[in-house]
Amino acid sequence: MSSLRQTLFLACLLSLPALAQQPTRPPITGIAFARFYTTDATAAQKFYGSTLGFERKEADDMWLYPVNHSQWIEVLITPAPPQPNVRMAAVAFTTNDADKLERYLEAHNITPDIPLKDGQFGVRDPEGNLVIFVQQNSVKPVATALASPSAASTRMIHVGFIVTDRAKEDAFWQQILGFRPYWHGGPKDDGVINWASLQVPDGTDWLEYMLNAGPSPNLHQTGVMDHFSLGVSHMNDAVTALAHNHCEGPNCTKTQMGRDGKVQLNLFDPDQTRVEFMEFAPAQEPCCSPFTGKHPTPGDQNN
């Protein structure tokens, strides 16, 4: 063997332990929760508890509203949110190995903003959004919660927030975490993309980039964009459930066809955060781009 070949062979051997030590990403299976601030506790309870029909739990000075045994909404009560025109505090995703995922992100030079404790840790994405990863079934008030008979939906299917630099966000969400393109589009047929959806690597839930928000969105504009979505098989069932829960106002029955071909209905909590009811599957062909992933179903939440 020539000296050059020997050198290359030895270099390969020496590199094998380092490669073997690189942690791999464990599965990220879906949305765990979305967390929002509210400035009106009574009105928030009426909206999330009475109108949407979720039973309230309390933990760590927060209100938890289980959607199912592995997904929930978190509400933080404060008279003065950190940013006056922003109510979203965090989004969270489920993994079956939070410890391994934390080490994986550290290996990619992403230092936890909130170190792993009680099955959860948090990091900041490139635009400063708090992203929490939750060990499967680690939140007992949710994992043991009974289904609410008055819930208008039992499935969270996506979360969305304002994104200003799509390339930077893609480097984190796609290249490091492995999220996959699902659909993108805009309000007009002019090629401008206002919404870009990325599915979790190991499930059907998705994150929606809300693009082109402008330099200074007001509270309502931010609330439209920083949102979460509840899935339903048939929108009429959601309308019926909302009526049973004494939903007030014209939005309670105002269904519309989304540009992605899915029927939707939008409500707003007391702090202008949008809750988007959406059918699991499209009722017609989407605009702008085809879907590139499997659609969610009622029973495929994080198990």
Predicted regions and their residues:
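Bacterial N-terminal signal peptides
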Residues: T7-P17
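Positively charged n-region of N-terminal signal peptides that target proteins for export
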Residues: M1-Q6
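Core segments of cupin and vicinal oxygen chelate
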Residues: P26, A32-I73, G119-G122, G160-L207, ...
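Short loop/beta submotifs within extracellular cysteine-rich repeat domains
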Residues: K46, E55-R56, Q71-E74, P81-Q83, ...
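Residues within well-ordered alpha-helical secondary structure of globular protein domains
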Residues: L13, S50, Y104-A107, Q175-I176, ...
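A mature extracytoplasmic/lumenal domain signature
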Residues: D40, L52-G53, D60, H69, ...
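Vicinal oxygen chelate
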Residues: Q22-P26, T29-T39, L64-Y65, Q71, A80-R155, G160-F161, ...
